[in-house]
Amino acid sequence: MKISVLGAGSWGTAIAIHLNRLGHQITLWLRDKNQFEEIVSTRHNKKYLDVDIPQEISITTDLKEAVTNSEIVVIAVPSHAVREISEKLKEVVDKNFIVVNLAKGIETSTLKRMSEVIKEYLSNDVVVLSGPSHAEEVVRQIPTACVLASLNVKACEIVQDAFMDENFRLYINKDVVGVELGGSLKNIIALGAGISDGLGFGDNTKAALMTRGLAEITRLGVALGSDPLTFLGLAGVGDLIVTCTSMLSRNRRAGILIGKGKSLEEALKEIGMVVEGVNTTKSAYRLSQINKIEMPITKEIYSILFEGKNPYEAVYSLMTRDKKHELHGI
């Protein structure tokens, strides 16, 4: 099967290598000419994922060349670039391939999920792939399980057959809204978990943040049409665990730096790659206001990131809120 992967960051590189191992004909598209020259000459993508890129994987900066005759096109760019790449795809598309989206985020200007953005430009079936999946582990063939979601279950089944092997297991879920929101909103909680670590707090604090974070993710998700059970699955609890606890998580690492006293700008500069949770915090905060949903952790992280609130004061605000029942609002 010919599969195109658009975006040569960590996840795009990892999924391209994984699919090449399965015997598919892979084309990896990128737009950065310097990165293109580096990969072509060294077969390494040093900035993002410094592993050998097999010679069988074609590398190109020509989008039309990349997607021509592809049966599946994987969008593996950051969430802020999904609209641009979708618009470009509309201009070059010549067949009804399945789109697989890997980006996890909510567009800040429109508050739309990534599949909604893609569908503005393409009539193709869109399959969302989400779950606990560090690229660094997938590329090393460490056992990983994720979830696929689409309005067309048949499209999910085609992707499931094409992507699965003994080290990469995929489940199907019909709840596109929940799967996308779980994958996006957990990055906010991971920033909070990192801030907690940076402040020197312990496991109790992180466990509380993760659990109460899941509660507010679920509240917003249900208000937007999700099945609450989705957030107990791989796109919810699964992704939340790995992103809040692993040092491979950019969101957690950025949070640690902020907890240690660095500004948001300094933290992002030190990470050197996209930290999706920052923009998602803006989007989720606005969604919570529009839908009148209580999201106290998101509110405090927003205040830390964009209003200069001291993290210790944010913790105090959370710990001294009015008394609640645990399942309030769910």
Swiss-Prot record:
Enzyme class per UniProt: oxidoreductase
Binding residue positions for sn-glycerol 3-phosphate: K104, G131, S133, K186, D239, S249, R250, N251
Keywords: Cytoplasm, Lipid biosynthesis, Lipid metabolism, NAD, NADP, Nucleotide-binding, Oxidoreductase, Phospholipid biosynthesis, Phospholipid metabolism
EC number per UniProt: 1.1.1.94
Binding-site residues for NADPH, renumbered to this chain: S10, W11, R31, K104, A135, R250, V274, E276
Active site per database record: K186
One Pfam family in the UniProt entry: NAD_Gly3P_dh_N
GO BP terms, alphabetized: carbohydrate metabolic process; glycerol-3-phosphate biosynthetic process; glycerol-3-phosphate catabolic process; glycerophospholipid metabolic process; phospholipid biosynthetic process
Cellular component annotations (GO), alphabetically ordered: cytosol
InterPro entries: 6-PGluconate_DH-like_C_sf (IPR008927), 6PGD_dom2 (IPR013328), G3P_DH_NAD-dep (IPR006168), G3P_DH_NAD-dep_C (IPR006109), G3P_DH_NAD-dep_N (IPR011128), NAD(P)-bd_dom_sf (IPR036291)
Compartment(s) where it occurs, according to its Swiss-Prot or TrEMBL record: Cytoplasm
Known pathway: Membrane lipid metabolism; glycerophospholipid metabolism
NCBIfam families, per database record: PRK00094.1-2 (NF000940), PRK00094.1-3 (NF000941), PRK00094.1-4 (NF000942)
HAMAP family reported in the protein's UniProt record: NAD_Glyc3P_dehydrog
Family: Belongs to the NAD-dependent glycerol-3-phosphate dehydrogenase family.
General function of this protein: Catalyzes the reduction of the glycolytic intermediate dihydroxyacetone phosphate (DHAP) to sn-glycerol 3-phosphate (G3P), the key precursor for phospholipid synthesis.
Official protein name in the record: Glycerol-3-phosphate dehydrogenase [NAD(P)+]
